[in-house]
């Protein structure tokens, strides 16, 4: 017990020191013009640390590792976003960070009981259908956004956690087979394939092909888990057909991709520096300009480029903070994903769920970072937690909550124990009241 308290205190101190060090670098090396703006930023960062840590003390759970790591990443992100174009407090990003923390707790509470999720999976299908309808009928001319006054929502971001929950399955569901022609498939796997086809078709219709690799990686991860579950009999015929189909789909996608995608695949960015290659050229120049330690917070020039705080945020961080800080920030996200290896899921459903979450984060991070560095064609995908965007931050927070649920799940017998304890407590309180009345 003492060791756990010591570990908790040490983690809190480390968290504060990290944020204080970054704020010190902003004050020393940054372009602090108005001290009041810097004080607002420092107050928001330290205040968010204190308030969230006090909230975590109010309830008990098996692990706080992911809570601390998420809080650390979000406040680092808030400092980054508040320095682009000058030192100021980015109130919009602060609100996004708070919503991300709230979404994390919601994801944890809603997905920790795998039996409840499995029994109510039909409501997840209904939610995905509603998101499809909202994208088709309510977004602005295939721009993927629903605009309400000064706020905008991207429904496709919320499909990711829903799709991962659809991909997760228990051993019972995988053993329930249906014979279709010469193949034996589980009903759950067949529904998964249908949902995946609808998602891919919708992304193609929305011209949001940058998100397709993320959904594709989640789907492939789910198929792999379904083929390799304990005592599974893997059909070589199904594996061969799946591989051939995958190759044919990739060839067709490469040859029949829309014109704007073809330009990104074949463009010479330096030959077309002020055209289709403008963003990537400026991103590469910014990374080279920043070097290892950066030019200082608020001293960069990439803030003038479109999507500097979302699609090419890695390059913007590299310019102002240096490749060292940008790499450490990404490494912190990777370590957060690796906590699953330290405290692995206790059941197969949560194992599949956490595998899907990890696959989604890794693919999305790879697309953003490699695209900013011109190692792959530019996709316009956000970098989890570090890019601006309320919808993306909420979806990422919910996914972290799913990771936390995998580490500290809630089983049916635990639910029954808690109900009995509450009943005993109510009975004890009622007995005390009756005694007081009698006396």
Predicted regions and their residues:
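Interfacial transmembrane-helix termini
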Residues: 5, 23-41, 58-68, 78-99, ...
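Transmembrane alpha-helical segments and their membrane-water interfaces
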Residues: 48-59, 78-127, 159-177, 221-230, ...
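Loop-to-helix entry and N-terminal half of a specific, functionally important transmembrane alpha helix
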Residues: 343-380, 386
